[in-house]
């Protein structure tokens, strides 16, 4: 077996059980990985120098194909209502079949950190059969210093082989595509999917499992920090604006998707960004556009002009879930440490497909826990398989249900405790629709959202007049300089006021129905933070 690159010779591929490999390329950088990827026909080069790959059938995560080993520990610890199980024996069979499938192949290995805080990071080794997947995960996680690689000993190992086909009868899964996690052995097996996002989310799921018991709350969020060390956290599902809104030229970006909040403050789990880039434009999102149109960026499922190789970001013919992966330092004002002090603001983003939530509302700590556990948004087409072309209302608890190994109340209680401990202001922001439901109304203007967020984060929104929303009970500003006052009260943007009232009451009912499963796990204060019961019943 040939091996190239810097590595820990005492802890190589054989320690993981990989044998009879043709070659292992260790910790290669972007130039070498570009070369291998292009020469193998895995990807093509854009006119701007980005590496462009197609993921084939799977253009998003496939949650139905994700499984966790159920053993004596996970049986009691895991949130099985939100996770699927396989036995230790089924996992072992799958693992051995992965090792057999790898024989004779050339693999790419990356040694990386999940987590910017040395006290809480997890040393992660990722084996991939594709060069562009190796570049992707190298871009998304945190790259150690070269001197650290010669002694790197992994805690978590991922093997990613899209050409592997699982057997549901043999392996206990549902299709030929599989993501299987064994927390006891700290091994993740990914087969059948060329969608690179499965790798990064496997690291996130692992950190979600281990960090709470160490006093760190893992979060599906973006984060940034102002000049006064005033960090802000942005919760939200894919497509709600986490990446876009945290890329603020007046604030330092900590990260765009996954963070921990603990005794030392906030820290990024990653060293890169994974931005949705459908309809990406230089005018609307200059930082993300610049980061996506240069050497070192990895583009997924973007359409290129056949002659010029110029990327057409408006073309969603392959999928609406086109993606750009790039290192954090491609953003000019990104943090070099990936860390920030205790946050001053928490923002929950919801793409409200019904068009009845206000563009911004202030939440009490109890309301914050209620809306965090509810995790309301609209699933946007393309971020997962099996969705149609229209957004669908979705309650994804903790704004990240697919990534939660533990019961949601674990994360909800941590959030409320941290908010109280650090006196954090909480906001609910609607980045979805205004002036009507999806199909009738229009998307909330990003300039309005940015203006309201700026006012919230710099403290000026605290000094304006608020009204209490009659449907949801939270506080909504009545006026703010530079923002049209009618947009602050959603009913004023609807032509049919009766239809608005009917739609708002229906959404209240949906919240109540969804939250019923959490009633027994929260106290009276959080139950009282729910939208008004009488309204839904009228």
UniProtKB/Swiss-Prot annotation:
Binding-site list for ATP: 201, 220, 236-244, 285, 323, 449
Gene Ontology annotations of biological process type: gluconeogenesis
GO molecular function, one term: phosphoenolpyruvate carboxykinase (ATP) activity
CC annotations in GO: cytosol
Keyword Metal-binding included in the entry's annotation: yes
Chain residues that bind substrate: 61, 195, 201, 323
Pfam families cross-referenced by the UniProt entry: PEPCK_ATP
Keyword annotations from UniProtKB, A to Z: ATP-binding, Cytoplasm, Decarboxylase, Gluconeogenesis, Lyase, Manganese, Metal-binding, Nucleotide-binding
Cofactor note: Binds 1 Mn(2+) ion per subunit.
Pathways per UniProt: Carbohydrate biosynthesis; gluconeogenesis
Keyword Nucleotide-binding found: yes
Catalytically driven reaction(s): oxaloacetate + ATP = phosphoenolpyruvate + ADP + CO2
Cofactor(s) demanded: Mn(2+)
Protein location: Cytoplasm
Binding site for Mn(2+): 201, 220, 257
Enzyme Commission number(s) from the entry: 4.1.1.49
Root EC class: lyase
Stretch forming the signal peptide: none
Family: Belongs to the phosphoenolpyruvate carboxykinase (ATP) family.
Function as written in the Swiss-Prot or TrEMBL entry: Involved in the gluconeogenesis. Catalyzes the conversion of oxaloacetate (OAA) to phosphoenolpyruvate (PEP) through direct phosphoryl transfer between the nucleoside triphosphate and OAA.
HAMAP family tied to this protein: PEPCK_ATP
The protein's name: Phosphoenolpyruvate carboxykinase (ATP)
Source organism of this protein record: Bradyrhizobium diazoefficiens (strain JCM 10833 / BCRC 13528 / IAM 13628 / NBRC 14792 / USDA 110)
Source taxonomy: Bacteria, Pseudomonadati, Pseudomonadota, Alphaproteobacteria, Hyphomicrobiales
Name of the gene encoding the protein in the UniProt record: pckA
């Amino acid at each position: 077996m040939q091996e190239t690159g810097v590595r820990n010779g005492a802890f190589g591929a054989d320690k993981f059980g990989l044998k009879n490999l043709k070659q292992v390329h260790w910790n290669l950088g972007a130039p070498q990985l570009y070369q291998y990827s292009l020469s193998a026909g895995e990807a093509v080069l854009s006119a701007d120098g980005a590496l462009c790959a197609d993921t084939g059938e799977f253009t998003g995560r496939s949650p139905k194909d994700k499984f966790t080993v159920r053993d004596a520990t996970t049986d009691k610890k895991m949130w099985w209502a939100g996770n699927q199980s396989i036995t230790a024996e089924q996992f072992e069979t799958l693992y051995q079949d992965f090792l057999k499938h790898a024989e004779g192949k050339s693999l790419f290995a990356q040694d990386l950190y999940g987590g910017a805080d040395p006290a809480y990071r997890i040393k992660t080794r990722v084996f991939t059969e594709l060069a562009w997947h190796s570049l992707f995960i190298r871009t998304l996680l945190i790259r150690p210093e070269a001197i650290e690689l010669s002694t790197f000993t992994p805690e978590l190992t991922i093997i990613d082989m899209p050409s592997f086909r699982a057997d549901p009868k043999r392996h206990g899964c549902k299709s030929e595509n599989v993501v299987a996690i064994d927390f006891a052995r700290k091994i993740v097996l990914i087969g059948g999917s060329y969608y690179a996002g499965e790798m990064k989310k496997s690291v996130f799921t692992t950190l979600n499992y281990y960090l709470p018991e160490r006093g760190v709350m893992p979060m599906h969020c973006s984060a940034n920090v102002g000049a006064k060390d005033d960090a802000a956290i942005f919760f939200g599902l894919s497509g709600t604006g986490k990446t876009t809104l945290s890329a603020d030229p007046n604030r330092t970006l900590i990260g765009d998707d996954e963070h921990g909040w603990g005794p030392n403050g906030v820290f990024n789990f990653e060293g890169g960004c994974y931005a949705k880039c459908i309809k990406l434009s230089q005018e609307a999102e200059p930082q993300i556009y610049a980061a996506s149109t240069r050497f070192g960026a990895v583009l997924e499922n973007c359409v290129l002009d056949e002659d010029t190789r110029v990327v057409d970001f408006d073309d969603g013919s392959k999928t609406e879930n086109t993606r750009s992966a790039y290192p954090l330092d491609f953003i000019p004002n990104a943090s070099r440490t990936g860390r920030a002090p205790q946050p001053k603001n928490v923002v929950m983003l919801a793409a409200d497909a019904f068009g009845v939530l206000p563009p911004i509302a202030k939440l009490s700590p109890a309301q914050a826990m209620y809306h965090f556990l509810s995790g309301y948004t609209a699933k946007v087409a393309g971020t997962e398989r099996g969705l149609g072309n229209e957004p669908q209302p979705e309650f994804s608890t903790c704004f990240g249900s697919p990534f939660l190994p533990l019961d949601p109340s674990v994360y909800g209680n941590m959030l409320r405790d941290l908010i109280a401990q650090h006196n954090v202001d909480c906001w609910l922001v609607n980045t979805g629709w205004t002036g009507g439901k999806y199909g009738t109304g229009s998307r909330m203007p990003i300039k309005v959202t940015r203006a309201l967020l700026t006012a919230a984060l710099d403290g000026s929104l605290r000094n304006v007049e608020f009204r209490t929303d009659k449907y949801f009970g939270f506080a909504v500003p009545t006026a703010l300089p530079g923002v049209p006052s009618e947009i602050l009260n959603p009913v004023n943007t609807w032509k049919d006021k009766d239809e608005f009232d009917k739609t708002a009451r229906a959404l209240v009912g949906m919240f109540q129905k969804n939250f019923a499963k959490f009633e027994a796990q929260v106290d009276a204060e959080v139950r009282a933070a729910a939208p008004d019961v009488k309204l839904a019943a009228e």
